[in-house]
Amino acid sequence: MNSLGINIYEILFQILHITLIIIFIIFFAATLSILERKFLAFFQNRHGPNRVGWFGSLQLCADMIKILFKEDWVPQFSKKSIFILSPIIAFVSLLLVIPTIPFTPNFLIINLNIGILFFLMMASLSVYAVLFAGWSSNNKYSLLGAIRASAQTLSYEVFLGLSLMGVIARSGSFNIVDIVNSQKEVWNVIPQFFGFLCFFIAGIALCHRHPFDQPESEQELADGYHIEYSGMKFGLFFIGEYISIITVSALISTVFFGGYFGFWGSSFFWLFLKTVFFILIFILIRASLPRPKYDQIMSFGWKICLPLTLLNLIITAFFILI
């Protein structure tokens, strides 16, 4: 401890914790990309990646080597500084939410009193990555994808926040730890089912996942806003998408399904099991649902999801007041 009363070793220990968890999440996200391809192959009655290693077990290493040795190309007429900054923002934005999630009753890296607001802030920051990427690429398909992504994400963020208001009203706090502790008896998914449903839908849209993958639809926009990216820059966008899936799945498990509280006891195992379950739901949705038109996506958000979140908030307020 120095003259200012700051424990240097405790700070270094916290930094080590954060670093190890971030490395684990990045590795898990990279592995998830291969697992998704295997699951999609299973659902579509084909083999999937099976050439590198035993049953394709080394495909992740092959993909990493390929991305590392690809030319890291920058378009000639692009805005180079913004072009380079965009994948970094996409990679980092939702990754920073992970340390605010309580893993066990006794293990939490950062205890923020405004944990939910911090998540919403980071979710809003991810929009800038897409918008900057599309605009700075100087490509019409990239720009169209960025415009789609910005409009879709900003629309769905409205009820992404509103769907959490019922949970916040019940727990009386924006702190994620307080929200988890309020679910010792009953998980929030039971009294807040409509809130959970809208948050899950908005989370899919936030991750730009099927069926809300309009910004990067290959058939219409030739891969959308990151068409001009290659090498490690594309890898950051690619891994960033899976990090967002992990973050949203972990938040759903924490806010609506009791977090580390299980059917008996409380441990990291329950949080991990719930998170993996929702990740599999993401993959299953991609394998089974068609992609609707862009106007249908926007109409669904404003005409169905937004009224549903407002109705859920009114019902929650009514039961709290009585």
Swiss-Prot record:
Disulphide-bonded residues: none
Keywords: Cell membrane, Membrane, NAD, Quinone, Translocase, Transmembrane, Transmembrane helix, Ubiquinone
E.C. designation(s): 7.1.1.-
Source species, domain of life: Bacteria
GO biological process: aerobic respiration
One Pfam match: NADHdh
Annotated localization: Cell membrane
Ranges annotated as spanning the membrane: 15-35, 82-102, 114-134, 149-169, 186-206, 243-263, 265-285, 302-322
The reaction(s) this protein catalyses: a quinone + NADH + 5 H(+)(in) = a quinol + NAD(+) + 4 H(+)(out)
Topology relative to the membrane: Multi-pass membrane protein
GO cellular component terms listed in the entry, alphabetical order: plasma membrane
InterPro entries noted in UniProt: NADH_UbQ_OxRdtase_su1/FPO, NADH_UbQ_OxRdtase_su1_CS
Role of this protein: NDH-1 shuttles electrons from NADH, via FMN and iron-sulfur (Fe-S) centers, to quinones in the respiratory chain. The immediate electron acceptor for the enzyme in this species is believed to be ubiquinone. Couples the redox reaction to proton translocation (for every two electrons transferred, four hydrogen ions are translocated across the cytoplasmic membrane), and thus conserves the redox energy in a proton gradient. This subunit may bind ubiquinone.
Family: Belongs to the complex I subunit 1 family.
Quaternary organization: NDH-1 is composed of 13 different subunits. Subunits NuoA, H, J, K, L, M, N constitute the membrane sector of the complex.
Protein name: NADH-quinone oxidoreductase subunit H
Provenance organism: Buchnera aphidicola subsp. Schizaphis graminum (strain Sg)
Gene: nuoH
